[in-house]
Amino acid sequence: MGSVDAANGSGKKPTVIFVLGGPGSGKGTQCAYIVEHYGYTHLSAGDLLRAEIKSGSENGTMIQNMIKEGKIVPSEVTIKLLQKAIQENGNDKFLIDGFPRNEENRAAFEKVTEIEPKFVLFFDCPEEEMEKRLLGRNQGREDDNIETIRKRFKVFLESSLPVIHYYEAKGKVRKINAAKPIEAVFEEVKAIFSPEAEKVEA
């Protein structure tokens, strides 16, 4: 349960926090704040995949083709990119955003990296609120129309909720009410990340 994993030859294991929340829950903004205030490195699974595609590598081309065909990129591919990013970064504490997307991702990540997250930060936000935000911001993303948005919610609920339940059973979920204004949400985040809160949890 709170056991420290044996280090895999590289000394201390990095601290990993999974950040989950539906589309429009505001987790990206909060991640930026956490990075700024607490010195974490923010790793977005989606950004890593996009960067790999851009690099024009063989791996990138394969990822691009899978996405084009509407297939899900295999867990191993995403995990390898995350692992590489963790190893190449001098930091030892990471926010992993938008991953694990499902139970299979979660199990594969723990098996491959032998890292269990310290906790899972879950930005809980009602669908109507997320919908309103996504339609309001329309950052030129063509996937921000109402049908697609609802599809994204459905996928999030069906695939990510089992992950949240799994970690809830281990007492590792820190749920944030993400329907509030940005500053109020960050106050809740701060209560979790401040050293006092960590001492209480320890």
Swiss-Prot record:
GO BP, sorted A to Z: 'de novo' pyrimidine nucleobase biosynthetic process; pyrimidine nucleotide biosynthetic process; pyrimidine ribonucleoside monophosphate metabolic process
InterPro entries assigned to the protein according to its UniProt record, in alphabetical order: Adenylat/UMP-CMP_kin (IPR000850), Adenylat_kinase_CS (IPR033690), P-loop_NTPase (IPR027417), UMP_CMP_kinase (IPR006266)
Binding site for a ribonucleoside 5'-phosphate: 50, 71-73, 98-101, 141, 152
One function term, GO molecular function aspect: (d)CMP kinase activity
Keywords: ATP-binding, Cytoplasm, Kinase, Nucleotide-binding, Nucleus, Pyrimidine biosynthesis, Transferase
pH dependence: Optimum pH is 6.5.
Cofactor note: Binds 1 Mg(2+) ion per monomer.
Catalytic activity: CMP + ATP = CDP + ADP; dCMP + ATP = dCDP + ADP; UMP + ATP = UDP + ADP
Coarse class of the protein's main subcellular location: cytoplasm
Entry's free-text remark on domains: Consists of three domains, a large central CORE domain and two small peripheral domains, NMPbind and LID, which undergo movements during catalysis. The LID domain closes over the site of phosphoryl transfer upon ATP binding. Assembling and dissambling the active center during each catalytic cycle provides an effective means to prevent ATP hydrolysis.
Name assigned to this protein: UMP-CMP kinase 3
Organism phylogeny: Eukaryota, Viridiplantae, Streptophyta, Embryophyta, Tracheophyta
